[in-house]
């Protein structure tokens, strides 16, 4: 009996240590501004609200970093902006899950938490959201060497309202300020390519420039809100002679995420179409 009493606590301690060691390490989170967003520094420590798949009350914009497995990084990076109507952030299904998928392809992925200007009681505006995505692009480009990223292969992926966020940087010059004291602000905020999944209409320009970032565009024809955006943006890219690949599925509605919860086989398999596009553009190949 005495021996048993000695062994049981030791066994319990061993199991606790083993369990802790087996738990995956949480991905690192990087605040976009060290002291908080400009003009709202005093709010940076306010706790976020979240439950299941959504986040709200975001006052300290950040990037959650998803690194490829050791030895698999190919030099490409993507910043992922989830949707949620600018009222909430569908962070897990449209931020974390696609970032993990991209990391499995050797792409260094960053899930963005940006400020929500339509959240009830919000003091933010669309300009603040634009500040967040521009700062995110500049942060990744300025620190590209740290993550073994090619600064000429940094893209943006936007879902629904996150597609509107992506448009805020895709169709503007975004050049850095060479005289800025902050080295991050010297980097360009313009993405080298973009991936838009059922994007909203906000931020889509009246005319797409010929040098617009190459675009992978995807959604469903029975998505009443988004279908007109898909056709309109495809037409504008075609008229400009800019590079675009469009996938419009007959059925799927809105918010099918990575497809695994859809009853439609074509929607379930849509990430394969994205992978093929990335491969065709040699964005999954190490340079």
Each model region followed by its residue ranges:
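Catalytic nucleophile-loop/oxyanion-hole region of alpha/beta-hydrolase
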Residues: 90-91, 97, 115-147, 260-267
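Short amphipathic alpha-helix adjacent to the substrate-entry channel of hydrolases
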Residues: 91-110, 234-235
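Active-site glycine-rich loops that stabilize anionic/oxyanionic intermediates
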Residues: 82-87, 221-222
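Short beta-strand/loop motif that positions the catalytic acidic residue
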Residues: 216-219
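N-terminal cap/lid segment of alpha/beta-hydrolase-fold proteins
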Residues: 23-72
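Primarily recognizes the serine-hydrolase "nucleophile elbow" in alpha/beta-hydrolase
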Residues: 131-212
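C-terminal catalytic histidine-bearing segment of alpha/beta-hydrolase fold enzymes
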Residues: 238-287
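Conserved alpha/beta-hydrolase "acid-adjacent" motif
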Residues: 224-231
């Amino acid at each position: 009996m005495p021996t048993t009493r000695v062994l049981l606590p030791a066994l319990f301690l061993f199991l606790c240590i083993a369990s802790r060691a087996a738990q995956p390490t949480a991905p690192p989170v990087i605040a976009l501004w060290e002291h908080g967003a400009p003009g709202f520094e005093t709010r940076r420590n306010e706790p976020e609200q979240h439950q299941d798949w959504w986040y709200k009350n975001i006052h300290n914009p950040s990037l959650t970093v998803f690194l490829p497995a050791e030895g698999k990084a190919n030099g490409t990076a993507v910043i992922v902006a989830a949707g949620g109507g600018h009222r909430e952030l569908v962070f897990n299904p449209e931020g974390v899950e696609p970032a993990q998928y991209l990391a499995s392809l050797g792409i260094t992925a960053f899930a963005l938490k940006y400020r929500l200007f339509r959240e009830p009681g919000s003091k933010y505006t669309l300009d603040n959201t634009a500040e967040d995505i521009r700062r995110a692009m500049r942060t990744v480009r300025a620190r590209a060497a740290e993550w073994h990223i090619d600064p000429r292969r940094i893209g943006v992926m936007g879902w629904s309202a996150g597609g509107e966020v992506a448009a805020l940087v895709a169709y503007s010059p975004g050049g850095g300020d060479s005289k800025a004291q902050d080295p991050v602000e010297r980097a360009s905020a313009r993405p080298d390519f973009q991936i838009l999944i059922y994007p909203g209409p906000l931020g889509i320009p009246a005319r797409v420039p010929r040098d617009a970032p190459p675009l992978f565009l995807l959604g469903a024809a029975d998505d009443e809100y988004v279908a007109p955006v898909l056709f309109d943006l495809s037409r504008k890219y075609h008229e400009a002679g800019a590079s675009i690949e469009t996938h419009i599925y007959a059925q799927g509605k809105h918010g099918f995420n990575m497809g695994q919860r859809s009853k439609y086989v074509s929607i379930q398999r849509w990430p394969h179409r994205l992978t093929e596009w990335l491969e065709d553009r040699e964005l999954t190949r190490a340079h």
